[in-house]
């Protein structure tokens, strides 16, 4: 049986109407956006410039993919491994788009904008509502909210880390795994997902001594996709 790709509705949001949808969307946007500071600092610690770091957030705008790609580069991996890792983790956003397209019913330039902000949070808030109007409101407010806060905090984190002579000496490179776990943990639901996450973690660690940087993450992502597809 093929799985249904709906993002978790575990963001602490229930079914709301009108103003409450916007309020919850902005609250969630700020909470998620703060992680952008961790990405900004981690990216600079991995020897990306402030400009490059901000460009990654503006153009990629996918937290897990960004942290994974920067982590690969920071560990000594090549550009191909970093891009492949980020792309694999970002495939879920494409699956969300399939779910959201009939609901949003957008075309032209608006469709391109919608694609950029189709993420876990915007899709999750949209699907948590009980009518199409509130769903669309939740999607747009959350999507734009996270985008704005994420990029603001990315800049703050990058500039702050850039003021340090050696960001890695302050342990900022540890922000990548810590923030990655922080992003993933709320999305786990049920014993099966926890078991799969634990197995993937052990599997990735077991590969580290034997393969180049980036390959463990790519292999783990492929394993997770395979397990999810067979569920």
Tell me what each language-model feature is.
Residues 1-21:
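Short, Lys/Arg-rich, polar N-terminal cytosolic tail immediately upstream
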Residues 5, 17-19, 32-35, 148, ...:
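Short acidic/polar alpha-helix capping motifs at helix-coil junctions
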Residues 14, 83-173:
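Helix-loop-helix junctions within the multi-pass membrane cores of secondary transporters/permeases
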Residues 22-115, 133, 149, 216:
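Pore-lining transmembrane helices
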């Amino acid at each position: 049986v093929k799985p249904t790709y709906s993002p978790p509705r575990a963001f602490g949001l229930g079914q709301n109407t009108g103003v409450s949808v916007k309020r919850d969307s902005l609250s969630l946007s700020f909470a998620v956006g703060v992680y952008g500071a961790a990405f900004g600092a981690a990216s600079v610690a991995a020897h990306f410039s402030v400009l490059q770091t901000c460009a990654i957030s503006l153009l990629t705008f996918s937290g897990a993919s960004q942290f994974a790609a920067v982590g690969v580069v920071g560990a000594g991996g090549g550009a191909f491994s970093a891009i492949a890792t980020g792309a694999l983790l970002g495939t879920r956003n494409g699956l969300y788009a399939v779910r959201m397209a009939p609901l949003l019913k957008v075309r032209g330039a608006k469709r391109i904008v919608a694609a950029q902000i189709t993420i876990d949070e915007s899709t999750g808030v949209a699907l948590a509502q009980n009518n199409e109007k509130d769903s669309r409101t939740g999607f747009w407010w959350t999507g734009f909210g996270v985008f704005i806060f994420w990029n603001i905090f990315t800049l703050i984190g990058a500039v702050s880390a850039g003021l340090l002579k050696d960001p890695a000496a302050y342990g900022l490179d540890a922000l990548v795994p810590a923030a990655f776990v922080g992003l993933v943990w709320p999305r786990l639901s049920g014993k099966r997902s926890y078991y799969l996450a634990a197995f993937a973690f052990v599997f990735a660690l077991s590969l580290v001594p034997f393969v180049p940087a980036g390959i463990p993450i790519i292999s783990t992502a492929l394993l997770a996709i395979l397990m999810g597809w067979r569920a």
